């Protein structure tokens, strides 16, 4: 059977079942999701060639995944720098930020220009918006979305390329075009429009009964891998 691509309503329902029926906590799933993102990045963009990563984090859970990924990427030998224009004032996100600070992961307060990003980084990790995003992009994030639209650096997007509609995908021809898309839990409908080189599935935590209920038809993760190529 074919892999299922989730619409927005289904993606929210799966998440809610993980929280309510299976009693996963947000921080538990965020840690597993962010770790799988770091592993997918490492498979596609080895630290030897792409050591400097600009990690762009949004205000919600997608941004939290980015903070987790930054911490694990640092442990894998990368040099991540975090751009977090609108930090979330909740203990979970404050703790994730604190962990990055304690690991001497730098952050920048201003969005880099296209020129400075090309000079200072080898890759951008796009962890701005998740499947709850609805256009238009808010003012706090316009500059970083424009950076990702204009840069020649490779981009790795977490779950949804920033600015894309979760179901319709790209809304304009100048939308973000990632080289790597890391779908989490299950791919969303917008992933059908993805034309980049690498598409991975991460978040190896979906209980078999939940997979059957939603007919997700997820691929088998090889061995002890935390992500699988789609």
Swiss-Prot record:
Highest taxon, organism lineage: Eukaryota
Protein family per UniProt: Belongs to the NnrE/AIBP family.
Class in the EC hierarchy, top level: isomerase
One Pfam family recorded for the sequence: YjeF_N
Gene3D superfamilies reported in the protein's UniProt record: YjeF N-terminal domain
Record's protein name: NAD(P)H-hydrate epimerase
Entry binding sites for K(+): 62, 126, 162
Binding site for (6S)-NADPHX: 61-65, 130-136, 159
Cofactor(s) the protein needs: K(+)
Assigned EC number: 5.1.99.6
Organism: Drosophila sechellia
């Amino acid at each position: 059977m074919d892999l299922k691509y989730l619409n927005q309503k289904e993606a929210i329902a799966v998440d809610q079942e993980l929280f309510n029926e299976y009693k996963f906590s947000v921080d538990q799933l965020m840690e597993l999701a962010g770790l799988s993102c770091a592993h997918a990045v490492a498979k596609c963009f080895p630290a030897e060639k792409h050591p400097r990563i600009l990690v762009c984090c949004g205000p919600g859970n997608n941004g939290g995944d980015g903070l987790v990924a930054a911490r694990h990427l640092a442990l894998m030998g990368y040099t991540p720098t975090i751009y977090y224009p609108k930090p979330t004032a909740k203990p979970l996100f404050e703790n994730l930020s604190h962990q990055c600070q304690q690991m001497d992961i730098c952050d920048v307060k201003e969005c880099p220009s296209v020129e400075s990003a090309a000079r200072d980084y080898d890759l951008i990790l796009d962890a701005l918006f998740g499947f709850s995003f609805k256009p238009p992009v808010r003012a706090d994030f316009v500059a970083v979305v424009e950076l990702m639209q204009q840069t020649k650096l490779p981009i790795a997007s977490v779950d949804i390329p920033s600015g894309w509609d979760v179901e319709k995908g790209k809304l304009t021809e100048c939308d973000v075009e990632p080289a790597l898309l890391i779908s989490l839990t299950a791919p969303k409908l917008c992933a059908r429009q993805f034309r980049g080189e690498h598409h991975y599935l991460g978040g190896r935590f979906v209980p078999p009964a939940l997979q059957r209920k939603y007919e997700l038809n997820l691929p088998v993760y090889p061995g002890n891998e935390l992500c699988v190529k789609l």
